Amino acid sequence: MRLLIISGRSGSGKTTALHLLEDEGYTCIDNLPVDLLPALIEQLSTSDRPSPRVAIGIDARNINNDLSRLMAMIEVGPLPRESYQVIYLDSSREVLLKRYSETRRKHPLSDGLTDLNEAIERERIILEPISNAADVTIDTSQLNLHELRSAIKYLVVGSDREGMAVLFKSFGFKYGLPVDADFVFDVRCLPNPYWDAGLRKLSGLSPEVIAFLNGEEQVEEMYNDILTFMRKWIPRFENNNRSYLTIAIGCTGGFHRSVYMSERLAKALKADYKNVQTRHRQIPDSSAPKHS
């Protein structure tokens, strides 16, 4: 049996996640009262269906808001730890406010005495036990609908089919750190193609920039050091029942060096892991994860 607990703040994409998982063959149950979870797990674990896959949505609308008991209920049940996973979707307060303003939907915790700001904060506190216990946290603040579906498919569905998922994400430090990174490597010390007028408008995906960086000794040293580090430590995470890993590579603008290094490292690790992808945050047409 495969059990996914899907949770997150309203407006962060939980419904989208459940719809995608349903399309992928999961039986989805939204807003299940926590107290009913043990009985459901018991029933499903003894089902005649071969390897049932179930996704359960749990959020702050729950009849019993004491969600701190959720993990204890699962842990004392019949499922081994590797059979279930907690997925938590979140967004920044500013993004949630904007989304509610655009859709003009009412927040589920809003009432005549609670404004939207207070409802969002109250929901964060209620869901804290789940967010703290999450195996996978997806920040959807900068994701559109297509990108969110791609991220869920990569992090959750992809790991079902192909073992551990590894994502290399390039970014520009001037635009902020990726909040979902497990490792961050800074390649700003490497020679910068930006200062070559002929390369400035090209990206790290272009043959000209690749040729420029391939010829630099520092680039080779950085590449080999990161690759050696990842090959040593990724198996340790995998042995600890980790299903995904996000490795962020940053340069100043996120357009040349970080893109080049992410692509090259992903290509090398593809020999060891089937589900290796890249995402280049500062290149708009490559925002969805791509197989290397």
Swiss-Prot record:
The keyword Electron transport does not apply. It comes from the Bacteria. ATP binds at G8, R9, S10, G11, S12, G13, K14, T15. InterPro entries: P-loop_NTPase (IPR027417), RapZ-like (IPR005337), RapZ-like_N (IPR053930), RapZ_C (IPR053931). The keyword GTP-binding applies. One of its GO terms (molecular function) is ATP binding. Keywords: ATP-binding, GTP-binding, Nucleotide-binding. GTP binds at D59, A60, R61, N62. NCBIfam families: PRK05416.1 (NF003828). Belongs to the RapZ-like family. Displays ATPase and GTPase activities. This is Nucleotide-binding protein TERTU_3824.
